Swiss-Prot record:
Keywords: Methylation, Ribonucleoprotein, Ribosomal protein, RNA-binding, rRNA-binding. NCBIfam families: L3_bact. The modification N5-methylglutamine is found at residue 150. It comes from the Bacteria. This is Large ribosomal subunit protein uL3. Belongs to the universal ribosomal protein uL3 family. The keyword Nucleotide-binding does not apply.
Length: 209
């Protein structure tokens, strides 16, 4: 997989083309991604680059992590991410920023969706509600039957039921990079990306481009 970066979702806005067309965009701040380790086929069996982003107090870092960051001579970050690398070499301490992308490029954006707590089947799986009248009593939003009788005598795995909704890893594919602001380390991506404002997102070149 081609190298990507870890950024922070700043929110949504819109920009206008020269023809006056409004384009909804998500603003992603690409803080400098500091390389903490470069893995190669000789020592690790595969090629990858490990990066960290943001800052974290020394008291909040384990001794193992502190030693890892100290060996790379970089400040401790709030998260560590690894990207497979097909070509090119990086050294510990190198910085990766928004300039690796260009306007018009397609990217995949991964983030953690907003948590919605315990949700019923209508909200979680788009089930239709039952009749409001015609003899229905207190069963307007219930899912209905969840299986058969003695055969098979169980509920199949994967059955759509009520449960915790959101707060899971979500990837939106093939979003267009509308603008790259290298001076302010901002990436403007067409459309919406997963997660709440201020959340970490991973931006990679699109696998289906």
């Amino acid at each position: 997989m081609t190298i990507g970066v870890v950024g922070r979702k700043c929110g949504m806005t819109r920009i206008f083309t020269e023809e006056g067309v409004s384009i909804p965009v998500t603003v992603i701040e690409i803080e400098p991604n500091r390389v903490t380790q470069f893995k190669n086929e000789e020592s690790d069996g595969y090629r990858a680059v490990q990066v960290t982003v943001g800052e974290r107090r020394a008291s909040r870092v384990s001794k193992a992590q502190a030693g890892h960051f100290a060996k790379a001579n970089v400040a401790a970050g709030r998260t560590v991410m690894e990207f497979r690398l097909e070509e090119g070499d990086y050294q510990a301490g190198d910085l990766i920023n928004a300039e690796i992308f260009q306007a018009g490029q397609l990217v995949d954006v991964t983030g953690q969706s907003k948590g919605k707590g315990f949700a019923g089947t209508i909200k979680r799986w788009n089930f239709r509600g039952q009749d409001n009248t015609h003899g229905n009593s207190v069963s307007h939003r219930v899912p209905g039957s969840i299986g058969q009788c003695q055969t098979p005598g169980r509920v199949f795995k994967g059955k759509k039921m009520s449960g915790h909704m959101g707060a899971e890893r979500v990837t939106v594919q093939s979003l267009e990079v509308v603008r790259v602001d290298a001076e302010r380390n901002l990436l403007l991506v067409k459309g919406a990306v997963p997660g709440a404002t201020g959340g970490d997102v991973i931006v990679r070149p699109a696998v289906k481009a």
